[in-house]
């Protein structure tokens, strides 16, 4: 039986707690509180009640029949996380962490965001539970995701653009950490992915595991068996781990994480951390990183803001090393082609992040038999990406 992380938050040599001394007691307290509430029937009941009545779960599994026929080969099934309230998987985690923050007596939540989806999901739960919310966002992403910035402000959050470094997700994370160190007594930091110091990778995974737990039951009821492969995009990797985790002990189900190859992994313009990186320490944990020979973080690139991150969750690093999961990379152009295909064949506009998983499914399906099943995590909808996609087609909105 798979039972990681260990007590100190390690997945093999990855994970752990590499943070300033000032945060150790806050993380210890968070660990203690989370371990208590994880087994608390009342907390769990409230969490599942909110997922059902506020988020709109369970999200269905949809057979992309026309697209599957067009591609030939395996059947492509979509786990429709795009249908959640706020339009992506992120809200599964923010609901859980906000309920925890409330029980810990914290009235202020902070968050970092790349594509803006986690920022929106954090602002949403802050409004839902009457909390103050501050969101840190790289100034580059603020430009790319103007609609989501406005959504956060509508929901009552303060959005702080970050102008340091590459002005993207990693820099927003740095600023959020600084804020937390300064205001730890009244502030809860909602990390949006399975990265950061322990207990975050475990906690975010547990809240996102609703995806895979639902999928297992739905596959059993609707198809009488489990899929041959799971496919999900990986930036930090929370939507992927949410789908993968409940399947880890099922060795006959392949797990495939799809990273952003950007303009190609042979260029410096990509974010394929597991495919090209090597281990190091960033944002409080040891994991694979995109770094130069001196250990300096290299700036990443992806057409999708949510995959534009030089690290990855430590559990993914471990799943790669032990061979349980496979990791591949898909270029901007391949993701765009899959984005357009899903629009045309199925009437579903996917997020650019999710389009990376779709693109790999489109490559894999024709190599398999018609009776094989590929379950793709459609982690979010594409409304936020309209301007980016239009720009690629030479259209200004």
UniProtKB/Swiss-Prot annotation:
Supply the alphabetized keyword list.
Amino-acid biosynthesis, Aromatic amino acid biosynthesis, Lyase, Pyridoxal phosphate, Tryptophan biosynthesis
The record lists the catalysed reaction(s) as: (1S,2R)-1-C-(indol-3-yl)glycerol 3-phosphate + L-serine = D-glyceraldehyde 3-phosphate + L-tryptophan + H2O
Q: Which SUPFAM superfamilies match?
A: Tryptophan synthase beta subunit-like PLP-dependent enzymes
Q: List the disulfide bonds.
A: none
Instruction: Identify the cofactor(s).
Output: pyridoxal 5'-phosphate
Q: Which CDD domains would you find in this protein's record?
A: Trp-synth_B (cd06446)
What molecular functions are annotated in GO for this chain?
tryptophan synthase activity
Enzyme Commission code(s) on record: 4.2.1.20
What InterPro entries does this protein's entry cite? Trp_synth_b_CS (IPR006653), Trp_synth_beta (IPR006654), Trp_synth_beta/beta-like (IPR023026), TrpB-like_PALP (IPR001926), TrpB-like_PALP_sf (IPR036052)
Q: What class of enzyme is it?
A: lyase
Q: Which family does it belong to?
A: Belongs to the TrpB family.
Question: What is the name of this protein?
Answer: Tryptophan synthase beta chain
Gene symbol here is: trpB
